[in-house]
Each structure stands twice: as C-alpha cells, then as structure tokens.
Amino acid sequence: MDGELRAQGLRKRYGPKEVVRGVDLALRRGEIVALFGPNGAGKTTTFYMVVGFIRPTGGRIYLKGQEITALPMYKRARLGLGYLPQEPSAFRRMTALENLLAVLEFQPLSKKERLEKAKALLEELSIYHLRDRMAYSLSGGERRRLEI
C-alpha cells in the first residue's frame, strides 16, 4: 500500500527494555484506527514514533510512499501528518481566526497570505462563521475542529 501511512517493524528500546517490538501499521486516508492493549504495552510509544515525538530504535515509517523515519515532527506536519492532543490546545482568550494566525506565524508566508490561508482553513473546517468568537466560547466539536 503506497497510498498513505505505513510503519514496518517499529521497535523502541529504553536501555535493556524493549517496549515496542516489531509493530507494523498500514493506514489509508479517512480510516479511523485505534491501538488497544494493556497499560505498558507500547501504544503511546508507537504513536509517538509515528508522529515524530520520539525516534524508533528500529523499523521504518512511510507517508505517501516517502520514508519519513528520520524527519522531525515539524517536517512531518508539513507533509500532512500531525498530532491532536487529548488536552485542549486552542488559546482560549483568542478568537478562532487569531488562533489560526498564531499557528501560521511559523510558516514562510506574508501577513496577507497568512490571513488568506487562515480564512480558507476556517471555511474548510466549516467554522468560518465563528472566526470572531473567542475559543473558550466554542462548543467542544467546534473547538476540536479549530485545534485540527
């Protein structure tokens, strides 16, 4: 499967303890996937390796056919692979538009381009009508879409 996200033989070792041993994943765009297992089974560690929080001890990770195993998290994000934490990550005292503009500050765009991109994202996420609302006043679902 060359379509989306693939991990082959992921391994992670902390000292003598191997916490992830030979995990393979193959995910297509739009799929909803869950990792199940007891505490300490390596679910979070596997996820962190895929998104780039930590480097695997072994194995490879591919996104759309391109190997990304050694890429830092921010470069993976530019390729479309991101992480949405369980905890709220929107700035509560900023508007929906201001939240997106703050994130776009890190992109090599002009002020005008950032504004256009932010407005396009608000449209894409179906929350353009909420652009001037403070993040704390959004519903849970609206806030999650903003955080995406």
Regions found by a protein language model. Name each.
Residues 66, 112-130:
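Conserved ABC ATPase "signature" region
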Residues 93-102, 131-134:
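Short coil-to-helix segment of the ABC ATPase nucleotide-binding domain corresponding to the Q-loop/switch region
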Residues 51:
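Helix-to-loop junction immediately C-terminal to a conserved catalytic motif
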Residues 15, 71, 98-113, 124:
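ABC-type ATPase nucleotide-binding domains, specifically the catalytic core motifs of the NBD
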